[in-house]
Amino acid sequence: MWQGRFGYREGIFIIYGLAFVGLLLQVIAGPIPATAFAYPFNLVGGSLLLAGILFWGIFHRRAIRRNSARFSFLSGHIATLTSIGGLLLLAVIMGLTKQIPAEMGRGLQHPIHRLGLSSMLSAWYFLLLYLYLLFVLGCVTTDRLMRLKLNLRDGAFVMNHVGLFIALFFGLMSSADIRQYRMQVYSDSDYPEWRGIDQRTKKMVELPVAIELKKFEIAEYPPKLMIIRNNSGKALPYSRPAHLSIDRTPSKGTIDRWQIEVLAHLPYSAAVVTKDSVVFREFRSLGAVHSARVRAANLDFPQEVVSGWVSSGSHVFPYRSLRLTDSLSLVMAEPDPKQYSSQVYLYAENGEIDSATILVNKPLRYRGWYIYQLSYNREQGRWSTMSELELVKDDWLYGVYTGIGLLLIGAAMLFLGPIPASTQAKREDHD
């Protein structure tokens, strides 16, 4: 071992050594602090990594001239496979272990938390193996660049490896530099909101962009009718609760041996107390609820017929159910949101004002920030006057995109490139 050309034993030993050092650091120092490798420390570390690869390339080139294989291990397939295998093993463990933020695991004495298995991305051994894989990838790419031939296959190899290196390198650089803030804006506020809560420090900070909520809107799925037990509130049947969606009127359906007929549906309504009953009338103002006039007939006992109004309720008006028997009631569940969005005004530091609509799952790109529609006041529902947004900025993101672009170019070059001679010969022999 450690004599002559390095083999798999040496490669695996390096992985074990890095993992052992990482475990010691994890036990002694705890997880990696969130800001430990933020700017400018990530810039210094990244520069040292690139300098190490450059110096390796210089010494490797000198060794080649002297017909020496002293530095060839790091650009060989053994180092590549063992470095990938070590990091892949950690990825499998991470997939099988519930991951929590490193801050939540501090002070917990269970070995899973003490060893960092529950917060793998903040573990020292993960960082060391990631850096080793990145260094090996850089050495492999440098070695190929020194032996580059002007053909499509070599070009594809370089594009793929350079692209992967750039994507992984800038992904590492940005991991501690991503800025995430949560901001709550209100439509009834007279002033825009400049402050956000830093998701790492949990402190309120002023941001270079302000947001004013003009209007919050929700598109909902049709409300659903269900039959529940009065004493437990559980929907029937217990094994697989059924419901009737009010997507049109009139409509009918069967729930647990009750035929339900929807005679009318008012998406915006309020209860009106008459002389002998409660009815619903159209009401397009704050707190308006979905309501439906229904008729329910027991299929086992046709003489049991009940009719009346049901509503989902809101933060202003209580829900209303229809009692079918002493133990059963027909209720309307709150409609599920289909899409929600915020119409906002955006204020920049230089005084410029813009307007935009932020949709859920469709972030808004604004002056280097990604603004996500995160949540709203669930209690108020579609009448929510509050919208919760998340503002994210990653200054290294374009580097990751560049790496992905080079990977795609390399894949296209491989696809369009000529068939290797050995493969072509095999096809001809087969024919």
Regions found by a protein language model. Name each.
Residues 1-431:
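Solvent-exposed, non-transmembrane regions of integral membrane proteins
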